[in-house]
Each structure stands twice: as C-alpha cells, then as structure tokens.
C-alpha cells in the first residue's frame, strides 16, 4: 500500500466533512432543507445541515484537500472536488437516515456518523478511478478513531456542542 496515496485520497473528504462545522460560528445559517419535513413529519436533514456549512466544506475540501497534490501530483483538482462533494452528500444522507430513525441532531450514531461521508466519497470516486480494496478497508478501520479525535478537538474549540 502506498501510504502517501492513501493519505492524499482520504484528505479531501476528511477536510470537507470536518470543516463544514465552521459554519456553526455564523450567526445566521440557512438549513439545506429550508425547515421542511419529510412524509414522516420529521425534518429532512435538520438545522445542522446548512448551505453555509456545505459551501465551506466544499471549498475547503476541494482546495485544501488538493493542496498537497501541488507537490505529489496524485489527485487532480477535479478529483478533490468530486471526493469533497461526495463526502458532503454522504453526510447529508447520514443526517436523513438519522432523522428517519428519530435521532436528534448531534446524537452519536456509530458507524453512520463516522463512515457515511467517507464511503460515499470513495464509492463515487470509484465510478471513474480505480481504488484498491485495501485502501477502502484501511480507511474504514482508521476513520472512526480519527473521527473521534477530531470531534473532541472541535468540541474543545467550541465548534461543536457535543464531543462526538
């Protein structure tokens, strides 16, 4: 396994998913679901999924996610964009599932919270690029640990209300 390629592959989705929380610092946020409910009467995504967070995640995931490739040339800017937008869409799907299961915003839902963004990102990426299964397995193994650590950091920095 090429560890450099592995890092460069998972970096854009990690940055996209992790930086969306920065929108919590905005006084005014616009929920992606516009406050609308699904047929079950529950919010589609909830207040935690905003246009501001999506755009922050997409831009940082794309550009900061791509930045190491200026030196190493493994991924293109388009690759970083695809990995980032797919990660954010995967996170939205996870929020949709959590609302259907009556889980409140911020409620820990292992492994949904930890893997939705990454697996969606890698699945979409494999539609046009080959990824060895060993990279996917390695990402699934290390992501919950990295997710927990980064969530605690975000909590202590007061970017998140819960440490999970």
Swiss-Prot record:
<keyword id="KW-0443">Lipid metabolism</keyword>
<keyword id="KW-1003">Cell membrane</keyword>
<feature type="transmembrane region" description="Helical">
    <location>
        <begin position="3"/>
        <end position="23"/>
    </location>
</feature>
<dbReference type="GO" id="GO:0005886">
    <property type="term" value="C:plasma membrane"/>
</dbReference>
<dbReference type="Pfam" id="PF01864">
    <property type="entry name" value="CarS-like"/>
</dbReference>
<keyword id="KW-1208">Phospholipid metabolism</keyword>
<dbReference type="GO" id="GO:0043338">
    <property type="term" value="F:CDP-2,3-bis-(O-geranylgeranyl)-sn-glycerol synthase activity"/>
</dbReference>
<dbReference type="GO" id="GO:0046474">
    <property type="term" value="P:glycerophospholipid biosynthetic process"/>
</dbReference>
<comment type="function">
    <text>Catalyzes the formation of CDP-2,3-bis-(O-geranylgeranyl)-sn-glycerol (CDP-archaeol) from 2,3-bis-(O-geranylgeranyl)-sn-glycerol 1-phosphate (DGGGP) and CTP. This reaction is the third ether-bond-formation step in the biosynthesis of archaeal membrane lipids.</text>
</comment>
<feature type="transmembrane region" description="Helical">
    <location>
        <begin position="77"/>
        <end position="97"/>
    </location>
</feature>
<keyword id="KW-0444">Lipid biosynthesis</keyword>
<keyword id="KW-0594">Phospholipid biosynthesis</keyword>
<comment type="pathway">
    <text>Membrane lipid metabolism; glycerophospholipid metabolism.</text>
</comment>
<feature type="transmembrane region" description="Helical">
    <location>
        <begin position="122"/>
        <end position="142"/>
    </location>
</feature>
<keyword id="KW-0472">Membrane</keyword>
<keyword id="KW-0812">Transmembrane</keyword>
<protein>
    <recommendedName>
        <fullName>CDP-archaeol synthase</fullName>
        <ecNumber>2.7.7.67</ecNumber>
    </recommendedName>
</protein>
<keyword id="KW-0808">Transferase</keyword>
<feature type="transmembrane region" description="Helical">
    <location>
        <begin position="51"/>
        <end position="71"/>
    </location>
</feature>
<keyword id="KW-1133">Transmembrane helix</keyword>
<dbReference type="InterPro" id="IPR002726">
    <property type="entry name" value="CarS_archaea"/>
</dbReference>
<comment type="similarity">
    <text>Belongs to the CDP-archaeol synthase family.</text>
</comment>
<keyword id="KW-0460">Magnesium</keyword>
<dbReference type="InterPro" id="IPR032690">
    <property type="entry name" value="CarS"/>
</dbReference>
């Amino acid at each position: 396994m090429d560890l450099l390629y592995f890092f460069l592959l998972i970096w854009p989705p990690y940055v996209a998913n992790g930086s969306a929380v920065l929108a919590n610092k905005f006084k005014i946020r616009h929920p992606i679901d516009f406050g609308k409910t699904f047929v079950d009467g529950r919010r589609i995504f909830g207040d935690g999924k905003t246009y501001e967070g999506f755009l922050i995640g997409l831009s940082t995931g794309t550009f900061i996610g791509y930045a190491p490739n200026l030196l190493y040339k493994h991924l293109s800017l388009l690759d970083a964009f695809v990995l980032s937008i797919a990660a954010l869409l995967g996170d939205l799907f996870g929020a949709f599932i959590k609302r259907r299961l009556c889980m409140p915003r911020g409620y820990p839902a292992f492994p949904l919270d930890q893997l939705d963004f990454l697996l969606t990102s890698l699945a979409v990426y494999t539609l046009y690029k080959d990824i060895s299964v060993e990279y996917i397995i390695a990402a699934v193994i290390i992501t919950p640990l990295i997710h927990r650590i980064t969530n605690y950091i975000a909590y202590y920095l007061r970017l998140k209300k819960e440490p999970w």
